[in-house]
Structure formats: structure tokens, C-alpha cells
From Swiss-Prot:
It is found in: Secreted, Extracellular space, Extracellular matrix. The lineage of its organism: Eukaryota, Viridiplantae, Streptophyta, Embryophyta, Tracheophyta. The gene is SBT3.3. Disruption phenotype: No visible phenotype under normal growth conditions, but mutant plants have enhanced disease susceptibility to the pathogens P.syringae DC3000 and Hyaloperonospora arabidopsidis. The keyword Zinc does not apply. This is Subtilisin-like protease SBT3.3.
């Protein structure tokens, strides 16, 4: 017994020693930290950088140690730096009065032929926004992503004029990338890898498959850049599907690529260091971009480290303060509620919808019944072939009949020379791809997948007949199999169907509101097509076909909005970033272009609401002439930060002016957003909005309200009169509830109309009679 106790004691002592050593190592190990100092105090960037080195040298003891520690100096749009610091060093520097905050480096992830005709921007129409703005010429779209493939035809500069005089950026040479690879279309390319390298010490730059330059290995950056501002490329298709002339939203706008995302084989994908992203933002501000398109997402914000503690949002605040419109992806974590990211009120956050385009794939059963599934199958027609449904696959005494994920559990079941039907509840394409691989390996000739219809992405390679149907159609096929002695099936090539009767939906993966941290700030703001978008890519992309690929995600919807903003910027160069947001939100489609309701995919399909698509689907032509705008400036953002409880000192350093928040603190409901979201209405609340006339000088607008269910909405005044002396007018909105219990959100709208313009903002109201109550039922 004594020996046993001695052994246990030795084990415990060893464990304590290991834990102490681990703790000591974590205290002394240097990791990248971002030191944020707020608005820069000096206009000379060299002076700003020198002040950063001096601050670091005073902490570390020598200039050499400071130089070795420094990763980046942020010196153009704002002041700060990234440096390798221990925890104790980070704490010491955070205590300095001139430091707003210090946080460890984080990471972000990566989140077309028919698109523009669908949105009413046909190049064949001489009288539309596209041609009124010379297709966005002189507007510069900055893209922060995985880089660019400069040889892609989407970046040809045929017919493009001289580089805009305001451009102060450049084209940085590197691995397989020359400064001469830029042209009048692709006017800038830079790369930022120091933060990534500091956090991935084992990364070998000489053996990496990625290019240590602005050249794109992954293809994602090339894809999104070409969606936003790609040039005209005729006769493009994806193996014969989705054919037509390919172009970006603003085909004569200029592209500047800032590569801050890197392929890492050990991580099996692409990752983006926040310190690299911050440097990309800093450089983009300096270079003179007009629009920043960022198809990157961080974690769903479920803690307090947001906004002023979120370096990504902080950097973008400085971009917006300099007049740059920032467009970001809302994320691909839908359809669950409160999954939307990039939620700061100065960011334009984008949801994804389908197009009015599909790829029906005829499945003909032996009884001559034709079922139209969905696929991107471009191989030869599969003639009449035996059709089977695997019965009684077993594992640990459980039966998995016909489950796609269990096809490998019954290797004795013959699939050779047959088409297999299976069912799945999986929302991942990886599981279906594995099922297809097993069927192919077993000698099968095709696969029909019955799955929840919300999961729209193509699950298989295009050279293998792999067709998706919903559960109802899958059950019809199964009934045929079980009622026929020798069931057979024929599968034809996929076709392209555009326009009616294909409806538009908010796609299942698109992240949803409400805003998890600031529920009174509506997110997402707007929606755009983001499913199976055909655009340029890198030759290394596994989905590459002739330099192009069809990809899906809010990553793809984001540059659609960026392209539209570029056109609007060319038309209204004097507008603020908030004005552009207001214009596209208040004029958005709340039905699809054919007047049909827009549904949202999820566990059950429902009519879309503002938490699915914000204001609706972007309507570029209407956004060009919105009539009224809900404008915002620094004071509105200060009001937001004060209402969120940030202290005067932090806000002052962020905005570069002395700020004293009122006591009591202001209401976030008064932030001049083109939406009204009330998350906790108990009795009655009154809020204020201000609209600015950007239409005819002498205008009269009258209000109409579609109130949320059980909610009274009173607007004062009911009529707004504008003239040469009265450009902006404020109004109040009194909202009260008739509900006697806590409710979910109900939705409505508030519209100002002058018989020409309809300026619509969404209303979202939740009654909370019992405040601060978590309802687990």
C-alpha cells in the first residue's frame, strides 16, 4: 500500500511539475499581439512608425529587440502595430495611457453569367446604371483575399482607360509575380504574410504550394475579384452549363488585390491572420481604394470582444471614416438564428440568395415517369440501367437501409453496373461525396441522393451521374423500386434553366440574424446572388474548368454588392458610405424580380424576413435614385459606441476627437440606420430618424406603415416637405405593443413615398413583458 501511495505521489508531483513548466512556458512564449493606438496623431507615416518602434524599444530594452519583435506598423489609416510579445509584455504595454487595447492575433476564414441580367444590369440596355456610369470606370475596388491570377481573361484591360490619378498604390513583385503583371484593370497587388509566419513557425516558405506573392494559389481571391469588377469575357460556360458572356458588376472598375490569406497544407485549407488583414486595410486606405470587398469571416460573435475590441471591425471603422465603403460577407453558418458575422454598424453585411437559374437533370424511371433532379452532370447520357436501393445495411446490430453514409457497411450488396438510390439528413457535401466515391469504387454507374431540399450545393464531381432530389421525390422513386421486379432508370445530362418558373430563395447556408451582440442593429443588411456563381479562378483550383469555376457562399454574394456599390460610387462620388448602404437597403426587392415571394431555406421553408435578407435583394437601378437616404457620420457611430457602454477615452482615441458620452447613455435605437429593430419592447418607446433628400429639390413625402403583428406604430410628422433650404428632416416613431406575453420577432415596414420613390425600411419588433428572461421552451 505504501508503495502504491508513493507511486501516486510521484505521479502527482510529476504532473504538477509539467503544469508549472507549461504555465511558465506560456508566460515566456512570444505570440503576435495587436497593439491598437486609435486615430493616428501625425500625418507623416515614417514618424508614426518611428513612434511605434520607440514605444516597443522602451518596453523591450533595445532598438534591436524592438526591430526583431515588430511584425507590422499600422501608419496610414490608423495608428498601431503588431509585435511578438509575451503575456507579461503585452500586459505592460496595455497599461500605457496612449494604448487603447492589446489583444492576441486572431484568424479569419474564407467565407458570373446570369447574375447581372437577373439584377437588371444587362449590358445590352443603353439606358441603365451600368452604362450611365461608364461601367464603373475610375472607381477602385480593393479586395482582401487569397490573391489574384493576373493572366485570367477577367482582368484584361481592353478598352480600359488610364489608371486613375488618385491611385497611390503599386504592384509588388514576388514569387511568380512581376510588377508588370498588373495593368490598367488590375492596378495594384500586395501581399502580407508576416503575421501568418509568426503564428506558424513550422511553415516552410520554400516548400509551400502557395506562392509567396500576390499570386493566387487557392482561386478564391481571383473568383471574388472577377465577380466585383471583372472585364467582359465572351463564350464562357461550365462544361456547357450557365453559358454566356462573363463579366463583373462594374466591368471597367479597377481592381487592387491585397493578399492576406494563405494556404497551409497542415491546416488543410486557407487561413488569414488578423494582423495581416489589418495591414492590408491600412495599405488599402493609403492607396486610395473606393470600395473594400472582404469575403472573410471570423467566429460568430458570442462574447463581448466585439467592435472596439475587434481589430477587424476597428480597422474597417477607419476605412469608413476615410470615405471607403466596406462590404463584408455575413457568413455561411445558416440557417440557425444569430449566426451572422461582421455585425458592426459601419460594415455593409451581405446575405446570399439563389439565382433564378437551376440545372435540372432528367431522371426517367422504367414506368416513364420523369423526375427533374438537380446536378451539374455534364457527362454522356446514362441509358436504361438497373436501379437499386440498398436494404438492411447493418452496423452494431443497427439497420441503416438506404442511408447514404452507410453504403460501405454492406460490401456484399452488389452495386456494380447499377444506379443507387440513398437518403441522407446530412447538411455536408463531404458525406455525400464519400457515398459517391464508394458507389464508383463498387462499380456503380450513378447515384440518386434524396436529401433535405435546403441543401442546394452540388455534392459530386461533374463527370459522375450524381443527382439530388428532395425527400418527396426520393420516396416516389423508392416506391417505384419496391413495386417493380426489375426497376431501371435513365439519367440525362444537366441543362440550364433561367427565369420563370425558377424561384429565388435565401439559401440555407447564409447566416441569419438577429445580431447576436447588438440586436438593435439589423444584420444582415442586404442580400445578393451567391449560389453557383460562375467566375474566374486559379488553375490550381480543383473545380477549375478552363480558368473558371462555379462556387457558392456569402463570399460570392459580397462582391456582387461591391460591384453594385462601384457603379453607384461612379454616379454619386460625393455620397458617404452610409448613404450607399441606405440607398440599396431602402430600394431592395422584397419579392423576386418576377413579383413572387422570396422564401428562406431552413429546417422548413418559410417566407423571408429581415433577419434572412436585411432590406431584401439588391435592386441596382432603384438604388441609383433612392429619393431619400438615412445618412450617418461620426456622431452616429459615437452614439452607437456610447450606447454599447464603451468608455470616453477609448471612443476618443478611436474617432480622433474628444468624446464625452451623455449620462444617462443614449439609446442605440436612435442610431440613424435604414431599419428599426426593437429587441425588448415592454410598453412603449419613441425613437428618431433623419432623412436627407437626394432627389428633386422640391419634394413632398408621405408616410405609410405596415406594422408588425400586435404592434402600434405612430410616425410624426406624417408628411415631410423638402425644398432648397430644407434638405434634411427628422421624424419620430412611437412604437407600442398590445401583446401581454413575451413574443418572438414580428416584422413590418415603414415607407416614405412621393409617388415616384418608395423609401422602405424594415421594422422588427419583439415584445418582452418580462425583461431579461431566457425562455428555454
Amino acid at each position: 500500500m505504501r508503495s502504491f501511495r508513493s507511486s501516486i505521489l510521484l505521479v502527482l508531483l510529476s504532473l504538477i511539475t509539467v503544469l508549472n513548466a507549461t504555465r511558465a512556458r506560456s508566460e515566456t512564449e512570444s505570440k503576435v499581439h495587436i497593439v491598437y493606438l486609435g486615430e493616428k496623431k501625425h500625418h507623416d507615416p515614417e514618424f508614426v512608425t518611428e513612434s511605434h518602434h520607440q514605444m516597443l524599444a522602451s518596453l523591450l530594452g533595445s532598438k534591436k529587440d524592438a526591430d526583431d519583435s515588430m511584425v507590422y506598423s499600422y501608419r496610414h489609416g490608423f495608428s498601431g502595430f503588431a509585435a511578438k510579445l509575451t503575456k507579461s509584455q503585452a500586459k505592460k504595454i496595455a497599461d500605457l495611457p496612449e494604448v487603447v487595447h492589446v489583444i492576441p492575433d486572431g484568424f479569419h476564414e474564407l467565407a458570373t453569367t446570369r447574375t447581372w441580367e437577373y439584377l437588371g444590369l444587362s449590358s445590352a440596355n443603353p439606358k441603365n446604371l451600368l452604362n450611365d456610369t461608364n461601367m464603373g470606370d475610375q472607381v477602385i475596388i480593393g479586395v482582401i483575399d487569397t490573391g489574384v491570377w493576373p493572366e485570367s481573361e477577367s482582368f484584361n484591360d481592353n478598352g480600359v482607360g488610364p489608371i486613375p490619378r488618385k491611385w497611390k498604390g503599386g504592384c509588388e513583385s514576388g514569387e511568380n509575380f512581376r510588377s508588370t503583371d498588373c495593368n490598367r484593370k488590375l492596378i495594384g497587388a500586395k501581399y502580407f504574410i508576416n503575421g501568418f509566419l509568426a503564428e506558424n513557425k513550422g511553415f516552410n516558405t520554400t516548400e509551400s504550394r502557395d506562392y509567396i506573392s500576390a499570386r493566387d494559389f487557392d482561386g478564391h481571391g481571383t473568383h471574388v475579384a472577377s465577380i466585383a469588377g471583372g472585364s467582359f469575357v465572351p463564350n464562357v460556360s461550365y462544361k456547357g452549363l450557365a453559358g454566356g458572356t462573363l463579366r463583373g458588376g462594374a466591368p471597367r472598375a479597377r481592381i487592387a488585390m491585397y493578399k492576406a490569406c494563405w494556404f497551409h497544407e497542415e491546416l488543410k485549407g486557407v487561413t488569414c491572420s488578423d494582423s495581416d488583414i489589418m495591414k492590408a486595410i491600412d495599405e488599402a486606405i493609403h492607396d486610395g481604394v473606393d470600395v473594400l470587398s472582404i469575403s472573410l469571416v471570423g467566429q460568430i460573435p458570442l462574447n463581448s470582444e466585439t467592435d472596439i475590441r475587434d481589430e477587424f471591425a476597428t480597422g474597417l471603422f477607419h476605412a469608413v471614416a476615410k470615405g471607403i465603403v466596406v462590404v463584408c460577407a455575413g457568413g455561411n453558418d445558416g440557417p440557425a438564428a444569430q449566426t451572422v458575422v461582421n455585425i458592426a454598424p459601419w460594415i455593409l453585411t451581405v446575405a446570399a440568395t439563389t439565382l433564378d437559374r437551376s440545372f435540372p437533370t432528367p431522371i426517367t424511371l422504367g414506368n416513364n415517369k420523369v423526375i427533374l433532379g438537380q446536378a451539374t452532370y455534364t457527362g454522356p447520357e446514362l441509358g436504361l440501367t438497373s436501379l437499386v436501393y440498398p436494404e438492411n445495411a447493418r452496423n452494431n446490430n443497427e439497420t441503416f437501409s438506404g442511408v447514404c453514409e452507410s453504403l460501405n457497411l454492406n460490401p456484399n450488396y452488389t452495386m456494380a453496373m447499377k444506379v443507387v438510390l440513398c437518403f441522407t439528413a446530412s447538411r455536408t457535401n463531404a458525406a455525400i461525396s464519400r457515398a459517391a466515391s464508394f458507389v464508383k469504387a463498387a462499380g456503380g454507374l450513378g447515384l440518386i441522393i434524396s436529401r433535405n431540399p435546403v441543401y442546394t450545393l452540388s455534392p459530386c464531381n461533374d463527370d459522375f451521374p450524381c443527382v439530388a432530389v428532395d425527400y418527396e421525390l426520393g420516396t416516389d422513386i423508392l416506391s417505384y423500386i419496391r413495386s417493380t421486379r426489375s426497376p431501371v432508370v435513365k439519367i440525362q445530362r444537366s441543362r440550364t434553366l433561367s427565369g420563370q418558373p425558377v424561384g429565388t430563395k435565401v439559401v440555407n447556408f447564409s447566416s441569419r440574424g438577429p445580431n447576436s451582440m447588438s440586436p438593435a442593429i439589423l444584420k444582415p443588411d442586404i442580400a445578393a446572388p451567391g449560389v453557383r456563381i460562375l467566375a474566374a479562378t486559379s488553375p490550381n483550383d480543383t473545380l477549375n474548368v478552363g480558368g473558371f469555376a462555379m462556387l457558392s457562399g456569402t463570399s460570392m454574394a459580397t462582391p456582387v454588392i461591391s460591384g453594385v456599390i462601384a457603379l453607384l460610387k461612379a454616379l454619386h462620388p460625393e455620397w458617404s458610405p452610409a448613404a450607399f448602404r441606405s440607398a440599396i437597403v431602402t430600394t431592395a426587392w422584397r419579392t423576386d424580380p418576377f413579383g413572387e415571394q422570396i422564401f428562406a431555406e431552413g429546417s422548413s421553408r418559410k417566407v423571408s424576413d429581415p433577419f434572412d435578407y436585411g432590406g431584401g435583394i439588391v435592386n441596382p437601378e432603384k438604388a441609383a435614385e433612392p429619393g431619400l437616404i438615412y445618412d450617418m457620420g461620426p456622431q452616429d457611430y459615437i452614439l452607437y459606441l456610447c450606447s454599447a457602454g464603451y468608455n470616453d477615452s477609448s471612443i476618443s482615441q478611436l474617432v480622433g476627437q474628444i468624446t464625452v458620452c451623455s449620462n444617462p447613455k443614449p439609446s442605440v435605437l436612435d442610431v440613424n440606420l435604414p431599419s428599426i429593430t426593437i429587441p425588448n419592447l415592454k410598453d412603449e418607446v419613441t425613437l428618431t430618424r433623419t432623412v436627407t433628400n437626394v432627389g428633386l429639390v422640391d419634394s413632398v413625402y408621405k408616410v405609410s406603415v405596415e406594422p408588425p403583428l400586435g404592434v402600434r406604430v405612430v410616425v410624426t410628422p406624417e408628411t415631410l416637405v423638402f425644398n432648397s433650404k430644407t434638405i434634411s428632416v427628422s421624424f419620430t416613431v412611437r412604437v407600442s405593443t398590445t401583446h401581454k406575453i413575451n413574443t418572438g420577432y414580428y416584422f413590418g415596414s415603414l415607407t416614405w413615398t412621393d409617388s415616384v420613390h418608395n423609401v422602405v425600411i424594415p421594422l422588427s419588433v419583439r415584445t418582452q413583458i418580462l425583461q431579461n428572461y431566457y425562455d428555454e421552451n
